[in-house]
Amino acid sequence: NYLDSRTKEDVEELASHHYEIWAKETGNPQPNCMFPAMFARWMMNNCEGFKEKGRKFMHNAPYILANLAGLSAEDAFIDWGTMSGWGLGYRVTEKKWSKEQLEILGIPMEMMPKIQKPWDIIGTLSETFAKETGLKPGIPICAGAGDTMQSMIGCGVIKPDQAADVAGTCAMFCIATDGINEELSKPENELIFNSGTLENTYFYWGFIRTGGLALRWYRDNVCNEAGNGAYFDELNEKAQNVPCGSNGVLFLP
């Protein structure tokens, strides 16, 4: 969803209302094209079939885990870190959906999955998928956690004022805090606020939407090496011979 801007006009319209509840409850002062909350709103407004037959909104990882455990739509869940990845629609410190925000977004509360702790056991591996995977049936399955949230643990960023620079699909700089910071949550800073995996952990992050994707674009469209994963090694070797400062060349993804 980093490059999916289908919600751009809706984001601009919603942002024009300057709802203070966004920053107060989520730490995010305004809507963003990347927020799943905006994609959910888009589906509610543009997909008649979904409005008629849809039961729950789910992220891909919880959806896979729910299927492995043989859960029904009524058992749909989301961990509290991934919940905060919605961007809007929840109370981040309480780890609960926000009735007021969801009403503004036009998303029915009953379509939201229940919020779990990342280490909660949501079920066990079903007989069907035990055969598919070659694993033993009955293995406990926990709710899991969001990718960036887990990256912060992997980097050791779990205490306020610690930070990490992450170069992935989306280039990110993250800094841990002890909660919502009014100064950092000002709209002009364009930062995103999330709950971490562990209890009472939070972080802000700034980003470039096409950080790592820009490398693939360069390989495919400039070097004409589409699909050649090994070509990145060749680019790395060539980059080693470039002097610091890249001779004044600046690339903006």
Predicted ranges, named:
Residues N1-A37:
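Active-site phosphate-binding/coordination module
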Residues N1-S16, G49, L71, I175-P253:
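Glycine/Thr-rich phosphate-binding loops that ligate phosphate moieties of nucleotide
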Residues R6, M38, P62-Y63, C170, ...:
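Alpha-helix/helix-capping structural signal
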Residues A15-Y19, M44-K51, N67-S72, L105-M109, ...:
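Structural signal for hydrophobic packing residues in well-ordered secondary-structure cores
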Residues A23, N32, E48-F50, G54-K56, ...:
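A general structural signal for short secondary-structure junctions and capping/turn motifs
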Residues A23-G146, P253:
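Gly/Ser/Thr-rich active-site cleft segment
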Residues P36-M43, L68, S151-C155, A214-Y218:
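Buried hydrophobic packing segments
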Residues G85-E199, T210, A226-E237:
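ATP-dependent carbohydrate kinase catalytic cores
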